[in-house]
From Swiss-Prot:
InterPro entries: Pyridox_Oxase, Pyridox_Oxase_N, Pyridoxamine_oxidase_dimer_C, Split_barrel_FMN-bd. It catalyses: pyridoxamine 5'-phosphate + O2 + H2O = pyridoxal 5'-phosphate + H2O2 + NH4(+); pyridoxine 5'-phosphate + O2 = pyridoxal 5'-phosphate + H2O2. It is an enzyme of class 1 (oxidoreductase). Its cofactor is FMN. This is Pyridoxine/pyridoxamine 5'-phosphate oxidase. Binds 1 FMN per subunit. Catalyzes the oxidation of either pyridoxine 5'-phosphate (PNP) or pyridoxamine 5'-phosphate (PMP) into pyridoxal 5'-phosphate (PLP). Homodimer. Keywords: Flavoprotein, FMN, Oxidoreductase, Pyridoxine biosynthesis. Pathway: Cofactor metabolism; pyridoxal 5'-phosphate salvage; pyridoxal 5'-phosphate from pyridoxamine 5'-phosphate: step 1/1; Cofactor metabolism; pyridoxal 5'-phosphate salvage; pyridoxal 5'-phosphate from pyridoxine 5'-phosphate: step 1/1. Belongs to the pyridoxamine 5'-phosphate oxidase family. Disulfide bonds: none annotated. FMN binds at residues 47-52, 62-63, 68-69, 91, 126-127, 171, 181.
Amino acid sequence: MPLPPSAAPDPIARFRDALARAAAASPHDATAAALATADARGAPSVRMVLVKSADARGFAFFTNRESRKARDLAANPRAALCFHWPALEEQVRVEGAVTPLPDAEADAYFRSRPRESRVGAWASRQSAPLGDRAELEAAVREVEARFPGDEIPRPPFWGGYLVAPERIEFWRSGPGRLHHRTVYVRRGDGWEVGALQP
């Protein structure tokens, strides 16, 4: 299959264009992606995250660093992301190594979050067992009492991660399930691009 005309040399620019089209077509959580990780034994797990930036460095997301995903990444620092935009009939898959983002970037993003989200970040022991909802609500009240104003510092157990892409695949629906697939593979400082069978 010949390369489609949209096979631009820069997959990050192509992704950002697709994301803009997805946000225009269906603005609710266009940045949501399935994040797949695996623990030290290779046991996989997947969940949705919001990707907050995509640039030449990679794809950034933020989370509790004591969560299952963070424990997986500490043991096995590789991950895959999958963006699916039904309104466009397109998806993008990203695979690569994962590293923690600098604290300064985590601080800046944390400050931009709504107050209730910052409170929730302190109150939730993400992925830990929960006895009942009252336990969590009590933790929220305790955090609100501790930080009565708008200045709520970033918890030391909360931060960001960067997926540095080594492989990015763009998929677009085609008639008769003859879909269009273009893959970019990192080669040194550049990208090798090619088409895949549907």
